[in-house]
Amino acid sequence: GLTLRTKANSIDADVIKMLHEAAERAERDFRAMVIYNQGEFFCVGANLFAVVMAAQQKQWDGLREMIHGYQYATQRLKYAKVPVIAAPYNMTLGGGLELCYGCDGVQAALETYAGLVEVGVGLIPGGAGTLNMLWRSLEAVPEGVEIDTQAFVVQTFKNIALAKVATSADEAKAFGFFRPTDGVSFDRARQLHLLAVGAIGEQVGDDAALDRHDHGL
């Protein structure tokens, strides 16, 4: 499993490097990868202090490298050869939600606040969140059904432009931030157990296993 250990579990250069290394090791040595953080927040996104300092010092190459590195890291998880599951809780904002977008499945705490909020500080999502928020909404469309894709693009743009935040895991599902099949845990103490069930039982594909355990069946 992977656990962030930065302040508020924020994203910085060391975390980005760790994500790449964790994906490689998971593919080499394990059957699945689990992202389970500790502390008050799951992940509040990028370390804005580091971003501001780099900008003030005009370290444009370093900023460019960090943005590209996190984009690649989330996509690296998305296309990993082993299933990746995240256990978001509390604040799962900006890069925290982008991290979830890179996962095959989510076992979220009911009290999860999720959204791409970068526009609030004058930025746009930098970790492939713009792409993956749209992709996640399109995933819910049944195969073969004709749709107006522009409507999905417009809604994604609104979600990002208004920094829309879901105030619960269920609302995150309703907004299309999480999949309908993603799990929700009322008790964080059970979250890790349910996470393991999802990772082992059919490598993320057995959503029924999560449902049975969450309802005590």
Show the residue positions of the predicted features.
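A structural preference for short, pocket-lining loop segments at secondary-structure junctions
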Residues: G1-L2, I16-D61, H68-A87, A109-Y113
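Conserved catalytic cores of soluble enzyme domains
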Residues: L63, Q71, Q75-A196
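N-terminal low-complexity segments that are often proline-rich with Ser/Thr-Pro
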Residues: L194-G216
